[in-house]
């Protein structure tokens, strides 16, 4: 864990504001570096360290950082509908704002300050820093501001982060109406307002609007520019003191947290148990029509584990949500660990589904010195300079590198690096190599150039949308033979791409991949044969962090074509196959949505993904998750379909208040708990009253959840019971969540307009 930072003596904010120089006050209002605020040593004001933390705390390094615990993605956590569990987890995101507030309370109970983001209407990556989101005042307040308002009221987070985009014509980071007016005066917000990274676009305007802290540092738009704005009276001394006071109050609050002075891996048994519970409790049982689940492993003689996600530990999404876990478990690992000895396991990939060619693992390569991984050496000079000096060197365990925040005092913005390794071919046949880069890079195999991503570059989605397409080459390898791999890389300023509207995080990035080429038809045929032979077939498909990531929007809702063909082919020969899907967001389930009989959705489940899946499959844990969002049958059925994407710098929110499933919903009865739709999604959000939800618990004891809504003298009483298939009453371990709200009104209302959550204490009749 590292040594705990010693507590500093407290500091007097009024004394500092009275005695600090103009330069010292100005320095407080921008970051010191990529992950720290600026200290004031003369007044005993420390620096505050920040980090991304939507599903785990990465620390202060994207590159060569400390490995961390990874929790399930936000939509997965929202699917638990369990505030006490989220409080324990300290995990942030979810469409249901009440669990979000529970996370904030849990995280801040340790002294850590939570920052909620992105305020507000940050709903697309296309032209992220320039797009103008145009919407009605009602839609803005009832849909896009309401989650922030509730989270602030319920949990008092320590900071709010502004979004990159504009809303109704003005960037949020310089909107006095939204920051000083609505957030501070109307809502009574007392905490810090900080920019997203490189999301400050002005000096005086942003400061006067209420933006306290520009991140990251070193400053671009404060410092000398702010001194000039004060000298020219575009910013008053009173405003400067007001912003400095807020930053000092933020630091004073943060200094109470007892955190490690040195970043190191935390891996405790209790953390693993909590992570496993989170993974299992987030899983949603979408179908169990034939009553196949739970499986009894003692009765199985053979199991077919099929699909591209089966041996892939899809534990998190991409972008700011990505981190390197200290361990991970794939569905294959979790399932096979709970099978008794002697059960035959038939594994087939069946199809490829990657968005980028899979990275090289440390076990597949070794450095020139013979250690696992790839050697990386940094230089000031390009390869053309003879006897250039190595400035820094390290060993990386994955064949990707993201260098924003990376610094070395001897390197300028433009620097160079060589990535080298020895590869022992795992098989004989054609292998495809891939290379994507922000900056420039070339790949050599045994000193022969096979990929040139330097001379000519094509724009792609890599590295938050700033990088190139993945350029590829196919090479025949011989099993057991040694090959020398070398990538010559130059940092971000060497890029030939010009991409307006995209955040420039600096540094540079690269990704090297390798995969054996397979015949798609043959791969499906092998999977079909395995499904025919096995007692039980479990089919694992879905998306990964390469499909769902910060920096770009998905252009469609489809799974890769080969995956859809695989699902259909397997269901043709094994109609009782268990379908296991993974994603953080909806995807198209046609044409097989109505064919599958048993379906579990597992999200991106964190470190314990595979074990959580196995616990549900084998009845160790009740699948109590409920969808926090809807899976539409097709993208054309979504309310935003006609309006999505920036056109001439603007996106119109034509759906108004009818976001998500709300457009499809009617409320003909007096109770808003009933969900009825015009064009039913494949799987609607939440659950219905007047219907039965089947769940299972260990020893195949099935549980039926009965929800009754009774009306007495104008008031509603909710009665919730659970009974086993054999008529026994008891607890299944699930966490019920019920909402109430108006359904019919003269004024058009969404289902959650004015909705109130009925607390768990309301189920005393259970």
Curated annotation (Swiss-Prot):
Residues 369-528 form the PA14 domain. Its EC number is 3.2.1.21. Transmembrane segments: none annotated. InterPro entries: Cellulose_deg_GH3, Glyco_hydro_3_AS, Glyco_hydro_3_C, Glyco_hydro_3_C_sf, Glyco_hydro_3_N, Glyco_hydro_3_N_sf, Glycoside_hydrolase_SF, PA14/GLEYA. The active site is at residue 196. Pathway: Glycan metabolism; cellulose degradation. One of its GO terms (cellular component) is extracellular region. Keywords: Carbohydrate metabolism, Cellulose degradation, Glycoprotein, Glycosidase, Hydrolase, Polysaccharide degradation, Secreted. Residues 742-756 have a biased composition (Polar residues). Pfam families: Glyco_hydro_3, Glyco_hydro_3_C, PA14. It is found in: Secreted. It catalyses: Hydrolysis of terminal, non-reducing beta-D-glucosyl residues with release of beta-D-glucose. GO terms for biological process: cellulose catabolic process. It is an enzyme of class 3 (hydrolase). SUPFAM superfamilies: (Trans)glycosidases (SSF51445), Beta-D-glucan exohydrolase, C-terminal domain (SSF52279). Glycans are attached at residues 19, 288, 453, 748. GO terms for molecular function: beta-glucosidase activity. Residues 726-766 are annotated as: Disordered. Beta-glucosidases are one of a number of cellulolytic enzymes involved in the degradation of cellulosic biomass. Catalyzes the last step releasing glucose from the inhibitory cellobiose. Belongs to the glycosyl hydrolase 3 family. This is Probable beta-glucosidase K. It comes from Aspergillus fumigatus (strain CBS 144.89 / FGSC A1163 / CEA10). The gene is bglK.
């Amino acid at each position: 864990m590292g040594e705990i930072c010693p507590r500093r003596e407290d500091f007097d904010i009024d004394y500092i504001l009275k005695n600090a120089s103009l330069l010292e006050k100005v320095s407080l209002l921008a970051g010191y570096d990529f992950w720290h605020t600026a200290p004031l040593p003369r007044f005993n004001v420390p620096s505050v360290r920040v980090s991304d933390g939507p599903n785990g705390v990465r620390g202060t390094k994207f590159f060569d950082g400390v490995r961390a615990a990874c929790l399930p993605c936000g939509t997965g956590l929202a699917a638990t509908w369990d505030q006490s569990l989220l409080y324990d987890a300290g995990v942030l995101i979810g469409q249901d704002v009440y669990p979000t507030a529970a996370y904030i309370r849990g995280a801040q109970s340790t002294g850590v300050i939570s920052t909620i983001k992105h305020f507000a209407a940050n709903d697309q990556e296309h032209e992220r820093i320039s797009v103008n989101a145009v919407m009605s005042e009602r839609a803005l307040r009832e849909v896009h501001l309401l989650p922030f308002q509730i989270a602030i009221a319920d949990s008092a987070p320590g900071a709010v982060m502004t979004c990159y985009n504009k809303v109704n014509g003005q960037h949020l980071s310089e909107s006095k109406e939204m920051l000083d007016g609505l957030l501070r005066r109307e809502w009574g917000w007392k905490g810090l307002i900080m920019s997203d990274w490189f999301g400050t676009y002005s000096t005086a305007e942003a400061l006067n609007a209420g933006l306290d802290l520009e991140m990251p540092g070193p400053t671009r738009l404060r410092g000398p520019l702010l001194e000039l704005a004060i000298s020219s009276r575009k910013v008053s001394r009173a405003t400067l003191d007001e912003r400095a006071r807020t930053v000092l109050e933020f630091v004073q609050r943060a200094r109470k947290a007892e955190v490690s002075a040195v970043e190191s891996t935390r891996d405790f048994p209790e953390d693993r148990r909590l992570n496993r519970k989170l993974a299992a409790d987030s899983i949603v049982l979408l179908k169990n029509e034939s009553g196949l689940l739970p499986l009894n492993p003692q009765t199985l003689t053979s199991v077919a584990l099929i699909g591209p996600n089966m041996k892939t530990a899809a534990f998190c999404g991409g972008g700011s949500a990505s981190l390197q876990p200290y361990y991970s478990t794939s569905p294959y690992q979790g399932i096979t660990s709970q099978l008794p000895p002697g059960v035959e396991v038939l594994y087939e990939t069946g199809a490829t589904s990657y968005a980028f060619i899979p990275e090289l693992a440390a076990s597949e390569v070794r450095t020139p010195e013979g250690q696992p991984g790839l050697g990386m050496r940094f230089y000031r000079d390009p390869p053309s300079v003879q006897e250039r000096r190595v400035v820094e060197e390290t060993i990386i365990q994955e064949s990707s590198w993201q260098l924003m925040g990376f610094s070395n005092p001897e390197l300028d913005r433009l620097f160079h690096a060589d990535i080298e390794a020895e590869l022992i071919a795992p098989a004989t046949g054609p292998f495809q190599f891939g290379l994507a880069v922000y900056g420039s890079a070339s790949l050599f195999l045994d000193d022969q150039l096979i990929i040139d991503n330097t001379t000519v570059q094509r724009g792609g989605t890599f590295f938050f949308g700033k990088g190139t397409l993945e350029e590829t080459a196919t090479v025949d390898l011989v099993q057991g033979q040694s090959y020398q791999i070398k990538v010559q890389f130059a940092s971000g300023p060497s890029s030939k791409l010009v991409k307006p509207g995209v955040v420039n995080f600096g540094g540079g990035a690269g990704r090297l991949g390798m995969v054996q080429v397979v015949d798609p038809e043959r791969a499906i045929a092998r999977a079909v044969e395995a499904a025919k032979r096995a007692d039980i077939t479990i089919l694992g498909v879905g998306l990964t962090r390469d499909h769902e990531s910060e920096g770009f929007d998905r252009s469609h809702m489809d799974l890769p074509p080969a995956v859809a063909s695989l699902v259909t082919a397997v269901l043709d020969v094994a109609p009782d196959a268990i379908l296991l899907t993974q994603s953080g967001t909806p995807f198209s389930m046609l044409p097989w949505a109505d064919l599958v009989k048993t379906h579990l959705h597992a999200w991106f489940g964190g470190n314990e993904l595979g074990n959580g899946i196995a616990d549900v499959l084998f009845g160790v844990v009740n699948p109590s998750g409920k969808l926090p969002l809807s899976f539409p049958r097709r993208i054309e059925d979504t309310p935003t379909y006609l309006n999505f994407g920036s056109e001439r710098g603007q996106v119109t929110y034509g759906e108004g208040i009818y976001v998500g499933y709300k457009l499809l919903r009617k409320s003909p009865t007096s109770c808003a708990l009933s969900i009825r739709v015009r064009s039913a999604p494949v799987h609607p959000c939440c659950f219905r009253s007047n219907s039965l939800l089947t769940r299972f618990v260990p020893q195949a004891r099935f549980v039926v959840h009965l929800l009754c809504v009774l009306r007495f003298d104008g008031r509603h009483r909710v009665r919730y019971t659970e009974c086993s298939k054999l008529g026994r009453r008891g607890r299944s371990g699930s966490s019920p969540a019920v909402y109430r709200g108006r359904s019919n009104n003269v004024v058009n209302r969404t289902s959650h307009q004015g909705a109130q959550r009925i607390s768990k204490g309301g189920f005393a009749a259970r």
